[in-house]
Amino acid sequence: MQISIIVPTFNEARCLSETLTQIQQLSPHQLIVSDGGSNDNTIEIAKNFTEFVIKGPSGRAPQMNAGAQIATGNIFLFLHADSRIEPASYKKMLHSMKNPEKIGGAFSLCIDSEKWSLKLITRLANIRSKYLGMAYGDQAFF
């Protein structure tokens, strides 16, 4: 199984290095950063981690599509630049995708905050995802 991780970016210099460092620890087949017109150091930071840095139209969906067009893996994982995936969760995804009946999925949402409102949003998003099969765009999905 070859995983292409696609990270759409727009002015993500403040958090990108940490995210890409964590992604490298997962040892994906390919890491693609698809930028939507950043005017900070996002592109320079991304080039320190991968040769696959593309500049495309702004907007999350067009950036994700641009990344998917050059992806060579047989599974595409879309992850926001300010997000993380636990190695154990990544391994569960790999195991799950060995089942030929599985066509994709999403990770649970976890917002690192003590605010009750964000905890509520997290809980409701995960309930919606689990029971209705509808993930939010902020969840990593594959």
Where are these regions (language model features)?
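Short glycine- and hydrophobic/aromatic-rich loop-to-beta-strand nucleating segment
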Residues: 134-142
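Short aromatic/hydrophobic "clamp" motif used to bind/position activated sugar donors
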Residues: 76
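A conserved acidic beta->alpha catalytic loop
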Residues: 35-43, 83
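Short beta-strand/loop segment that forms part of the nucleotide-sugar
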Residues: 7-8, 24, 28-37, 54
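Conserved donor nucleotide-binding strand/loop of the catalytic core
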Residues: 29, 43-70
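Acidic helix N-cap motif at the loop->helix transition within catalytic regions
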Residues: 14-18, 40-49
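Conserved donor NDP-sugar-binding/catalytic core segment of glycosyltransferases
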Residues: 88-117
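Short, well-formed alpha-helical segments that are part of the catalytic scaffolds
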Residues: 11-25
